[in-house]
Amino acid sequence: MKVENYTRVKLLTDSYLQDGVGIGSIGYVIKICPSEKYEVEFSDKNGVAIAQIVVGPDEIVIEEKSNK
């Protein structure tokens, strides 16, 4: 999986429910951290940030925008 800054990703875990995001939440990579970690920002439908968390590569998958 090739993840770069501004890559759209989907969260695969409920480990961050306390931060307001769970499985299926969509976010964008804003920083690539050491040890294959990624800082991801999740926002609501109005673009207001909900959470900014550091996740591992096994906790996200690249999410292509749907045409819906």
Locate predicted features.
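Basic/aromatic-rich interaction segments and small domains that mediate binding to polyanionic partners
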Residues: 3-68
